[in-house]
Design a protein with these regions (language model features):
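Conserved helicase motor core of SF1/SF2 NTP-dependent helicases
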Residues: 36-53, 57-264
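Conserved helicase NTPase catalytic core signature
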Residues: 1-47
Length: 264
């Protein structure tokens, strides 16, 4: 909870919040919450003036709708070119049955749309603002994403200081080394050739499209340095090693949203 500054603030216990919502919000007008709990953290007869939802591309439609139901106005923030929410197969099967039985319009379907995508298609007249400035990656890295995914609309705010080898591609020797979303040859090359060159260059993270590969890397290196792209979204390191696993194009590893998040 974020309170008003410049005076002594009243204190509330957790049990006070629902029965004393009006008093509480006057003292603490900004409430931080997950999308799941936004509706239940205040009295059911009370609504916020605004709900601001961040990372809306990772929110499913049902949960997003619940969050909207507790506010008069909404600001939806997200990037539909990043990874959407993940639905497990059991839930997806159940949702498809419901969508088919009730002939749900495509733009409201949780199996094909994130909350952000649905809002963009439903509220076509709502004003949209592109946050163009990019502060994370080296210009040579973000320009790849900018050209491939954002139609050149991003403005890199980082500086190119003439660093060498900002982006390096290492192609492993061909062979039967990629099985079951796991590539031992890549792991060996990362351990013997890539990591030794990064020991004095800041923090290092390893990302991969597949959980099997991440687990195998961590076992071999004896540390939790690797993770899937989905779990790594939003994090950053000075150096990122991307282990693609597949030696041929696959639907999963060539997914544009996954590649955008992984590279940036």
């Amino acid at each position: 909870f974020i309170g008003r500054q410049g005076r002594n603030r009243r204190l509330f216990s957790v049990k006070d919040i629902k029965p004393r919502t009006e008093e509480f919000l006057k003292e603490y007008p900004v409430v931080l919450s997950t999308t799941y709990t936004a509706k239940n953290c205040i009295d059911k007869n009370w609504v916020f003036d605004y709900v601001i939802m961040d990372e809306a591309s990772q929110v499913d439609i049902t949960t997003g709708a619940l969050a909207l139901s507790c506010a008069m106005n909404a600001v939806i923030v997200g990037d539909d070119k990043q990874l959407p929410n993940v639905i497990d197969e059991r839930t997806k099967t159940a949702l498809k049955a419901i969508e088919s039985a009730y002939r749900i319009d495509e733009k409201y379907r949780s199996t094909t749309h994130s909350f952000l995508q649905s809002c963009c298609e439903v509220f076509t007249d709502a004003p949209q603002t592109l946050l163009r400035e990019h502060y994370r990656c080296h210009p040579k890295i973000i320009e790849f994403c900018n050209h491939l995914f954002y139609n050149g609309e991003l403005v890199p705010m980082t500086q190119d200081k003439g660093e060498e080898n900002v982006v390096t591609v290492i192609q492993t020797v061909k062979g039967q080394h990629a099985r079951g979303h796991y590539n031992q040859r890549e792991i060996d090359v990362i351990q013997s050739e890539v990591l030794p060159n990064l020991t004095n260059n800041g923090s290092v993270g390893i990302i991969t499209p597949y959980r099997n590969q991440a687990e195998a890397i961590n076992r071999q290196l004896g540390t939790k340095i690797a993770s899937t792209v989905h779990k790594y979204q939003g994090r950053e390191c000075d150096n990122i090693i991307m282990s693609m696993v597949d030696n041929t194009i696959s639907e999963f590893s060539d997914d544009p949203n996954l590649l955008n998040v992984a590279i940036s």
